[in-house]
């Protein structure tokens, strides 16, 4: 494990992400209950239980399993939400927004556990599901119709959430690249045994 991806940093990042997702699902649960969208609030109960148990996965350092289960939950949740309410609410955007998380999780897990999360497979699966939900709405339409103002507000919220996820993942990856380059330059410029500048440093 390199200096950037310490176990403490891994645990902290996963706890923050898990808490963020748990709070989102609590908010969605309230929304679905308020508007009597039965299938979704039942599904959200299982989602909230899963994210409550997510802290156990982090504690046991089961990061690859955790990221893959998060991917499955997000895909199922957003596909079902889009089928119930349609694409106008922006739930399908999470299928796009989570793709950087899969690749970040893949690298993260490889550094900490030496296990893959299969980011490419999950990304392709998200793309397929994204197309499927749009095609399904085109031919069938949503099961529930809610006020246009509510639809607009939820769509904005989903957009903000997905932008936040993408920005966070990209900023962490850039931070890692910079840290890795600095470490490589340090190793190239200084002798590992004597800690003195070597001939490459002189160049």
Annotate each PLM feature.
Residues 186-203:
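Conserved nucleotide-binding and Mg2+-coordinating catalytic segments in signaling enzymes
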Residues 21, 25, 50-51, 57, ...:
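Hydrophobic transmembrane alpha-helices
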Residues 1-7:
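Short, Lys/Arg-rich, polar N-terminal cytosolic tail immediately upstream
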Residues 157-185:
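Juxtamembrane or sensor-core-proximal signal-transducing alpha helices
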Residues 41-47, 152-162:
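Alpha-helical transmembrane segments of polytopic membrane proteins
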Residues 7-64, 70-71:
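Hydrophobic alpha-helical transmembrane segments of multi-pass membrane proteins
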Residues 16, 125-126, 163-167:
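Hydrophobic alpha-helical membrane-embedded or membrane-associated segments
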Residues 33, 37-40, 59, 63, ...:
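Transmembrane helix-loop junctions in multipass membrane proteins, especially transporters and channels
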């Amino acid at each position: 494990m390199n200096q950037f991806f310490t176990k403490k940093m891994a645990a902290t990042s996963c706890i923050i992400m898990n808490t963020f997702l748990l709070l989102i699902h609590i908010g969605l649960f309230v929304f679905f209950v308020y508007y009597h969208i039965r299938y979704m609030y039942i599904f959200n109960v299982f989602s909230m239980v899963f994210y409550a148990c997510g802290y156990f996965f982090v504690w046991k350092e089961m990061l690859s399993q955790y990221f893959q289960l998060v991917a499955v939950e997000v895909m199922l949740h957003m596909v079902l939400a889009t089928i119930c309410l349609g694409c106008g609410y922006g739930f399908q955007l999470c299928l796009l927004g989570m793709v950087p998380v899969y690749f970040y999780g893949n690298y993260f897990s490889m550094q900490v556990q030496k296990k893959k999360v299969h980011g490419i497979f999950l990304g392709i699966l998200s793309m397929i599901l994204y197309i499927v939900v749009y095609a399904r709405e085109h031919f069938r339409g949503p099961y529930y119709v809610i006020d246009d103002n509510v639809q607009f507000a939820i769509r904005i919220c989903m957009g903000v959430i997905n932008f936040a996820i993408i920005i966070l993942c990209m900023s962490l990856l850039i931070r890692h690249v910079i840290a890795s380059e600095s470490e490589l330059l340090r190793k190239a410029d200084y002798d590992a045994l004597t800690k003195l500048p070597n001939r490459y440093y002189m160049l």
